[in-house]
Amino acid sequence: MMEEIDRFQDPAAASISDRDCDAREEKQRELARKGSLKNGSMGSPVNQQPKKNNVMARTRLVVPNKGYSSLDQSPDEKPLVALDTDSDDDFDMSRYSSSGYSSAEQINQDLNIQLLKDGYRLDEIPDDEDLDLIPPKSVNPTCMCCQATSSTACHIQ
């Protein structure tokens, strides 16, 4: 630790350390040059042109046909979604025919029947207005004036 402090204070020691750094940098540059010569590349990697053997052969490129035949399904593949079903019991469209507003009335009646089956009678029971008029409970049950005085009796003026 003391040697480092002395080196920074002594100009002769500082010049020696600068020479050491310069020598190290020069060694690194030489090693980099030798490595680039071994690889067959000269100069910076930015200026290098790509080699011809880096390009993929034309026979290996996959180009789709114009007819998009890849979209056709082979017989062994199954579709993701089956649209045709045999059962018509799920939803009966004949009840909801488009014959004017009578179909809307039919739907409304069906909804009312379903609500009654489920036990909801929201449209038949009127709202109780007394429920809306309940005052909120007070947070502090005592009077504010009682807390301010030290007496046990509370007097409101």
Swiss-Prot record:
The answer to keyword Protein biosynthesis applying to this record is no
Where, per the database record, does this protein carry Phosphoserine?
Answer: 44, 74, 87, 94
* Alphabetized UniProt keyword annotations: Acetylation, Phosphoprotein
Cite a single Pfam family from the UniProt record: FAM219A
Q: Disordered: where is this region?
A: 1-103
Tell me where in this chain the PTM N-acetylmethionine is found. Answer: 1
Q: Where is the composition biased (Basic and acidic residues)?
A: 17-33
Q: Which family does the record claim for this protein?
A: Belongs to the FAM219 family.
Name of this chain's protein: Protein FAM219A
What's the encoding gene here? Fam219a
